[in-house]
Amino acid sequence: GMITASLVQNSNFKNKYFSKYTDKNNTDWIRISLDASDQGKSPNGSSVRVELAQKTKWALKGTHSFTYTFFGNCSNASEAKFTVGQFLASKLPNANGKATDRPLCRIEAEQGKIVAKIRNYYEADKVDEINGDPIKIELGAWIPSKETTIKIQTEDKKLTIFRDGEKKESITFTEKVLSDERNYFKAGIYYQNKDSPQIFTEIFLKNLKIE
């Protein structure tokens, strides 16, 4: 199917790396699946991914939020590990001088649970062992067929995660995360372990809203 013009206008998202949408009966669900994502390759490694990326970028100054609803179908939910929404700092140089996006908050389906993983620094993945593991916030069980609504909210450097309207936890970014760096939101499937691409997964997204 084709994505509707109204959804394109209202969502403030552009598509990248994926080829399939469904919008049956004007429900405005967007389908993202392995059969779409296997056409792309992440520059961060060999993992396939699909994504909707925010067009405009924002800084931690002020209040910003990203809300979306999703459900899915997974052939092995107890083993699959993938990101289904996140925000990143845009194009910060690494030790080699190459500009790289830095994930600060990921919402992941992780072996039957939904978790938030938060980095309180900009370091690249390869040096995480030096700087410590991300902060992990458990958001409850992941039942693929059940609709789940996630809200990621920032108020200056205070980050709060909501699930289905319930506040789960807040953390405050340290001085290592700067207020004036530009950030952006993404939604999609980003596999987090080598076995997940062999597990059939499809996610349906709707009501994507940035404020």
Tell where the protein language model's regions lie, with residue ranges:
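N-terminal entry module detector
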Residues: G1-Y17, R182-K186, E211
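Secretory/extracellular carbohydrate-interaction modules
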Residues: V8-K117
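Short, surface-exposed beta-strand/loop "edge" segments at domain boundaries and coil↔beta transitions
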Residues: A36-S46, K91-A99, Y121-I130, E169, ...
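Short, contiguous, pocket-lining structural segments
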Residues: L60-G62, G140-P144, Q153
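Ligand-recognition surfaces built from glycine- and aromatic
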Residues: T63-S65, A77-K81, T172-E211
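Short tryptophan-centered beta-strand motifs in secreted/extracellular beta-sheet-rich domains
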Residues: Y68, S145-T154, L159-I161
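Short, aromatic/His-centered strand-loop micro-motif at the edge of beta-sheets
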Residues: A116-T149
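Short strand-turn-strand beta-turns centered on an Asx-Gly dipeptide
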Residues: F162-K167
